[in-house]
Amino acid sequence: MRDNTAKGITAGSGSQQTTYDPARTEATLTTTTFALRRYDLAGRALYDLDFSKLNPQTPTRDANCQITFNPFGGFGLSGSAPQQWNEVKNKVPVEVAQDPTDPYRFAVLLVPRSVVYYEQLQRGLALPNQGSSSGSGQQNTTIGAYGLKVKNAEADTAKSNEKLQGDESKSSNGSSSTSTTTQRGSTNSDTKVKALKIEVKKKSDSEDNGQLQLEKNDLANAPIKRGEESGQSVQLKADDFGTAPSSSGSGGNSNPGSPTPWRPWLATEQIHKDLPKWSASILILYDAPYARNRTAIDRVDHLDPKVMTANYPPSWRMPKWNHHGLWDWKARDVLFQTTGFDESNTSNTKQGFQKEADSDKSAPIALPFEAYFANIGNLTWFGQALLVFGGNGHVTKSAHTAPLSIWLYIYLVKAVTFRLLLANSLLSKSNIYKKTAN
């Protein structure tokens, strides 16, 4: 979790912790509660603010549009929750900033829970335990809500001649065929078994050492898609994985306790169509310790990536070179696949990435899934305004290359939102253009 300027509120502690942003280690995000922990001025922990269990109400205002508050009774509450609170409350806080002019007002950056799980999966961290390994009394931390397992490769000489081809396997090795079909929940020896087919090829620069490179079904570099079953080729889809266990069995499959489906790669258009569920959100929170009505939720704003990309300067719609002076083709492919622009569109005449070297077809640049959530942040209170910076979607392999920030959401006390576009750099004040939102 990222904590910029909040002095009285930070993340809770737990047995399992992981830092969401490695550059900021002063606060951590627990994988069990996803809660903010409130501290007093002496540094003593008071209580946790768990949004999934919180029943908030919006504060009341006086004739001057000021929040009504007294030290004993707390905030005046209207009795109604903020709009779309049921969707927002399931998101995870990843950054918090305290208003220097109001010790009770905080701005919280919320992201979908699946984004944090995806971040942990990319970093190779342990996922939340949802099961235990069979035959062992110890809990296996590598078996999480995704159903992932880690096991060292072992040679099995007894099954060196085994073939997953049903009748062919039965004729060549009857005992092996019987055991194979039994492991898959069937005792019928005539049942044919379909195996996962992965085609491989040698790298051109690694023929001597025998290293292999995936040619198809490369799930690490391409989004998971469901394809037609042809022969024995099997392709997975994103719904085969999940983010949280489902005790009612309403998840990705019909088995009890199966994980709910999630999509690790989201296009800009998908986030735009369902902002309460998939976008990053800004929550304005009022919290006053020792008061009867101590917590109130002022408002919720969603950060729309489609609006961000629509305001890109023309120069940013062209392909970019990385800091090595080389064009990152892998980054371009990831950009296409994660934004949904990998499909041909003959009517597309906008500036963007050239899809084919011998063609004039191009796709408009869009904010990738990872860049959208990774770059939005750096909450900063500036007087009565809150600045939220966002990235321009530049994809690079280097972890030290900071993308230019082009977007600021400014929150004012009178509930007026201004959006500013930085054309070149955050430090160049002469290139700021203002746009007032409706």
UniProtKB/Swiss-Prot annotation:
Residues 156-170, 191-206 have a biased composition (Basic and acidic residues). Pfam families: P1_N (PF12378). InterPro entries: P1_N. Coiled coil: none annotated. Residues 1-22, 156-264 are annotated as: Disordered. Residues 171-189 have a biased composition (Low complexity). Belongs to the adhesin P1 family. This is Uncharacterized protein MPN_205.
